[in-house]
């Protein structure tokens, strides 16, 4: 079993190794963060307000299954984008639509990464709202478990996705 992905899905592939499941033999990580604090929120020690605000807007559109807003944000001019359905329901039509509606309702309560990240003035800041620290949502925090998985890791990055050049280097 293997996993691969870009950006979010790349981080998910890397987090898969934390479980140390013996069936997982390799992951391919492309353009993915390693340390959320230094790679995204405070690159170079300076709060990256524009990125965090934009990321929050993208998250809001994803949480609402809003294809039109996402398309406009990335500069796509798609005719009739407003009628695109977004994420497809899974399973039979009745249960799938019901599950999708519930998921969209559940996602309305997701946190505001822009507002919450502004509170994190130092690396080990503890968020009461999420009952967690930023390092716990970073692959670097789980390096021992990732290495103990024994899985092969193929990671590459570059200028393509923001500040992840350092993430690629720091991973080693």
Regions found by a protein language model. Name each.
Residues 18-20, 25-149:
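Accessory cap/linker subdomain of secreted extracellular hydrolases
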Residues 162-169:
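Conserved alpha/beta-hydrolase "acid-adjacent" motif
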Residues 8-10, 34-36, 160-162:
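Solvent-exposed loop/turn segments at secondary-structure junctions
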Residues 155-157:
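Short beta-strand/loop motif that positions the catalytic acidic residue
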Residues 12-16:
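Hydrolases whose catalytic domains are alpha/beta-hydrolase-1, hotdog thioesterase
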Residues 1-8:
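Alpha/beta-hydrolase fold nucleophile elbow
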């Amino acid at each position: 079993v293997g996993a691969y992905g870009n950006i979010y899905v790349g981080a998910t592939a890397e987090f898969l190794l934390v479980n140390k499941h013996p069936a997982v033999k390799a992951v391919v990580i492309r353009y993915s963060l390693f340390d959320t604090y230094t790679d995204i929120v405070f690159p170079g020690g300076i709060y990256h307000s524009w990125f965090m605000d934009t990321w929050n807007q993208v998250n809001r559109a994803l949480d609402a299954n809003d294809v039109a807003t996402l398309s406009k944000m990335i500069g796509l001019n798609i005719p009739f984008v407003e009628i695109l359905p977004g994420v497809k329901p899974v399973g039979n039509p009745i249960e799938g639509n019901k599950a999708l509606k519930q998921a969209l309702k559940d996602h309305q309560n997701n946190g505001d990464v822009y507002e919450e990240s502004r509170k994190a003035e130092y690396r080990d800041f503890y968020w009461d709202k999420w009952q967690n620290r930023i390092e716990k949502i970073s692959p670097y925090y789980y390096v021992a478990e990732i290495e103990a998985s024994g899985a092969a890791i193929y990671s590459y990055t570059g200028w393509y996705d923001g500040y992840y050049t350092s993430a690629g280097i720091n991973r080693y």
